[in-house]
Design a protein with these regions (language model features):
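Alpha-helical scaffold segments in carbohydrate-active enzymes
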Residues: 20, 47-58, 98, 120-124
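Structured surface interface patches that mediate subunit assembly and partner/cofactor docking
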Residues: 1-12, 32-41, 64-74, 94, ...
Length: 189
């Protein structure tokens, strides 16, 4: 059984997510750029936006994370260190003309992992700036499906047990992406 959505659904979810996050941050304004993002210690909203831009930049540029994920993501942040938040959003939006047509052709499940990462950070930003929303978006469904699919491939009984948990896709995503404490997870069942 696969929990993954179709490549076209995954691609559409990413386009919707990017459009939503760009609009959210444009409305919030440059003033939120230096807002700390509690779920990404040592990162600000601008740094998370730099990573969101860096993902498609690196995908198109053939830059792979290698063994050091922290160095890879830090390079994305460093690349845009001197850019304003608004210029990062402009570049991310413009990137759509190049990446959107090829998204449906990304390898499975890498395409869903791409959306999983972006969706996780959308909600990190939302939490940081106090703008809850998009908890039932297609991107959340893609991200939760990616996690469930990954769990389904593991032989451990605990992984299989997690597949039977009946919480919202949003809570499943936040719990299994390290954004919930043990107490918060217990409260949700």
């Amino acid at each position: 059984m696969t929990y993954l959505l179709s490549p076209d659904e995954v691609a559409a979810a990413y386009v919707e997510l990017r459009t939503r996050v760009v609009a959210l941050l444009r409305e919030a304004g440059e003033g939120v750029a230096d807002t700390p993002v509690p779920h990404c210690p040592a990162w600000t909203v601008k740094m998370v936006a730099s990573h969101l831009l860096g993902l498609p930049e690196d995908s198109l540029g053939g830059i792979k994370p290698g063994d050091d994920l922290d160095a890879w993501t830090q390079a994305q942040v460093d690349r845009h260190r001197n850019d304003s938040l608004m210029s990062i959003l402009d570049a991310w939006e413009k990137m759509g003309t190049t990446i959107d047509p090829i998204l449906p052709h990304f390898p499975v499940p890498m395409n869903s992992q791409f959306v999983f990462d972006a969706c996780t950070h959308e909600h990190d930003i939302r939490a940081a700036i106090g703008k809850v929303g998009a908890r039932d978006s297609q991107a959340v469904r893609v991200a939760a499906g990616f996690i469930r699919n990954s769990l389904s491939l593991l032989p451990q009984p605990e992984a299989q047990e997690l597949l039977r948990v009946t919480i919202s896709d949003f809570d499943f995503l936040r719990s299994l992406s390290g954004r919930r404490s043990v107490e918060q997870i217990a409260e949700r069942g």
